[in-house]
């Protein structure tokens, strides 16, 4: 930990405990209390169809634990949430809960302008992530190459690390892509990408399994897909629970980067057209907003063959492993046959057995469209998974203390190793060839 972080004020407020306040048909007394701008609710939704009804109201779905969805609703969305007919329980003022997690003391000269509150300083902000990547290049110049896939809306470089035994050469080897922090508030995912980088560089000289995987693969790692959103989430010194990027659309600021991929985009009610919704895609009558990340994937088609074979998109939270399709409840659909679905589910099940999470097709959670998993598979036949990391439930939700970083990233080591081992030919896991 840097000296700057050790000198941060230690008097930040402790983690909040949300009060469970059930909704009643009537109220006992009129209240003069100000209506919260955002309220947390727990919704009982035991089927994918019920969860999809909730998601289509435009509320911010935070996570799932069993038959419970934790969501955040603005006042104008609450009537639609109640209209679903599902059991809804009020868990309190969301912004008050975020404030109670702590606030940075910007009067401390050692504190940067973009930093995490006390108890969270082990997380990397954008500049610290860049510093970490540059240090990796210095420490392992023969294993890594750092480049930018382009610029964010606000002009930040979208850094990507290539990990290979010959990083300056485009070798004829299966390529693997890891993406982290697509959603701004999911800070633990940056640490996951940095964990993979550290493990497969520092371990190269001493671990034969790691050496074999690095020697036989080209691994691309993008630790912070959405740096503008990340910096906005922590800019005030308290967490904002910001999900989207910072690119303006016609009605508000921000588009959900994981509802903005072109395959089956906007087809099935899997994202909101409301500008304030946390799953807002670009306007339905216009194409998805351009992003450098799909362009990079397209450039990996060499001689008519896509070089990237597999992909994991890291998210929090709910402790799930998901695979395509998200736009349909069907296990098979155009471009995804029974054998391919079996390979997806078999590898997903094997990985889940190693990190102790649940596994399911994406739409078994609820319908989504315009996602990276559906696009990578539907357009490029890249075996693409989402890992929803720790925690399982809304406590502590998106903001676990930094004391969990080591344990909750190391938890995925064996699953990542298995994933890389099958990245030359995923159907091998069901006894098929490529």
From Swiss-Prot:
Residues 1-33 form the signal peptide. Residues 34-114 form a propeptide. It catalyses: Releases a C-terminal residue, which may be hydrophobic or positively charged. The active site is at 388 (proton donor/acceptor). GO terms for molecular function: metallocarboxypeptidase activity; zinc ion binding. SUPFAM superfamilies: Zn-dependent exopeptidases. Disulfide bonds: none annotated. Its cofactor is Zn(2+). Residues 270-295 are annotated as: Disordered. Residues 282-293 have a biased composition (Basic residues). Transmembrane segments: none annotated. One of its GO terms (cellular component) is extracellular space. Keywords: Carboxypeptidase, Hydrolase, Metal-binding, Metalloprotease, Protease, Signal, Zinc, Zymogen. It is an enzyme of class 3 (hydrolase). InterPro entries: Carboxypeptidase_T, Peptidase_M14. Gene3D superfamilies: Zn peptidases (3.40.630.10). Binds 1 zinc ion per subunit. It holds the Pfam family Peptidase_M14. Its EC number is 3.4.17.18. Residues 122-423 form the Peptidase M14 domain. The keyword Cell membrane does not apply. Zn(2+) binds at residues 183, 186, 315. CDD domains: M14_CPT. Belongs to the peptidase M14 family. This is Zinc carboxypeptidase. It comes from Saccharothrix mutabilis subsp. capreolus (Streptomyces capreolus).
